[in-house]
A protein has these predicted regions:
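A short, hydrophobic C-terminal helix/tail in secreted or cell-surface proteins
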Residues: 183-187
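Flexible coil/turn and secondary-structure edge motifs
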Residues: 1-182
Length: 187
């Protein structure tokens, strides 16, 4: 299988019957309970390469209430890290960003996203190659979707003026929840 082509449903790994991590559980670095409710918050899911580094970007973004890493956009139920790494699940490494829209705008969150990875690389980021490293945005509200589309268009114009190619970032509505990953790739 080509690492830069999405797996078909016929060739996707079968996956597991139960989630890799069951709730409740806590963020390994911050200690936050990951099923903690945040009234008046919004959540957006961002894929921009390796999720460990991407998640750290949002820890220091004002108005971000919580982050978590896992997988979205795939075919295989309850995949493990090793399964996702094969490219045979269809999932992307993803950061869940929960934020207070009264403190930080969706546009500001998306600016951090776009300015901290190369959204023109397709199924890779730098030396990390594979569908799991693709650039994607999964929105949870129609307003987020419209904002993401507008921000992507503006950013695309700037990239073209600077001599870069087309943005390959996929934007869609989240049609499922984040599949949490184990705290370590060895798990």
């Amino acid at each position: 299988m080509n690492k830069t082509e999405m797996v078909s449903s016929e060739n996707a790994l079968p996956g597991g019957h139960t989630p890799v991590l069951a709730m409740p559980f806590f963020h390994r670095v911050t200690g936050d309970r990951l099923d903690r409710p945040f009234p008046s918050s919004e959540t957006i899911y961002l894929a921009m390469g390796c999720f460990w580094g991407a998640e750290k970007l949002f820890w220091n973004t004002g108005g971000v209430l919580q982050t978590a890493v896992g997988y979205m956009g795939g075919l295989t139920p309850n995949p493990t890290y090793r399964e996702v790494y094969t490219g045979c699940t269809g999932h992307a490494e993803t950061v869940r960003v929960t934020y207070d829209p009264n403190q930080v705008s969706t546009e500001a969150i998306l600016t951090v996203f776009l300015e901290n990875h190369d959204p023109t690389q397709g199924m890779r980021q730098s030396n990390d190659v594979g569908t799991q490293y693709r650039s994607a945005i999964w929105c949870t509200t129609t307003e987020q979707f419209m904002t993401a589309t507008t921000v992507k268009g503006s950013y695309q114009a700037n990239l073209l003026n600077a001599g870069y190619g087309a943005i390959t970032t996929a934007i869609s509505m989240a049609n499922g929840c984040l599949l949490y990953t184990s705290p370590s790739p060895r798990d």
